[in-house]
């Protein structure tokens, strides 16, 4: 077993001889380490495991190594799903999305669906409230988080321009989709 930085490119690990497993370890919302396990004489694709460490134990998701066919969309449905660090690094979010019939939004590692996604510690679920042009969104007074994906302005600049205080229940995604810029207001379900 070898321990690697969370920044390691998984494609580099695939070059290791007799690689049987790759564990992506998440703790408190951060990818903490990547473990590569090699067994003498092992031949075949490695099992990919997303491991979520908690104070009272751990939860694992394991890849099936099946081919994945995702459908991509430009517009959002009723719900938005954002994979956590272990799912994002392991790319197991693609397997879950295929099983759950989620559609991959063309922005980042975000998915959308009209069905309420199941509750999971491996991803965050949001209800889409509004999709608008930059700075045209109607924001709730209780505040929220801001995350940018490909958007040129820093979240603090966006927050200042909007005059929106910090909060936990709501989130604003400032995204760049091709040449278009959008702001997506969502309400956290977890």
Question: PLM features: what roles do these ranges have?
Answer:
Residues 1-190:
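SAM-dependent transferase fold signal centered on methyltransferase-like domains
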């Amino acid at each position: 077993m070898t321990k690697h930085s969370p920044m390691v490119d998984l494609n580099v690990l695939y070059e290791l001889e007799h690689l049987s497993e790759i564990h992506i370890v998440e703790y408190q919302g951060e990818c903490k380490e990547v473990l590569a396990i090699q067994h003498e004489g092992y031949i075949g694709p490695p099992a990919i495991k997303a491991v979520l460490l908690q104070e009272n134990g751990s939860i694992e998701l394991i890849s099936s190594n099946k081919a994945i066919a995702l459908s991509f969309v430009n517009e959002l449905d009723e719900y938005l799903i954002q994979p956590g660090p272990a799912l994002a690094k392991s790319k197991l979010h693609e397997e879950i999305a295929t099983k759950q019939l989620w559609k991959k939004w063309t922005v980042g590692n975000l998915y959308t669906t009209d069905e309420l996604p199941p509750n999971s510690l491996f991803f965050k679920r949001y209800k889409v409230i509004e999709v608008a042009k930059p700075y045209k969104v109607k924001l709730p007074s209780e505040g929220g988080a801001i995350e940018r994906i490909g958007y040129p302005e820093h979240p603090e600049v966006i927050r200042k321009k909007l005059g929106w205080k910090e909060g936990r229940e709501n989130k604003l995604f400032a995204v760049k989709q091709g040449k278009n810029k959008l702001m997506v207001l969502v309400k956290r379900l977890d």
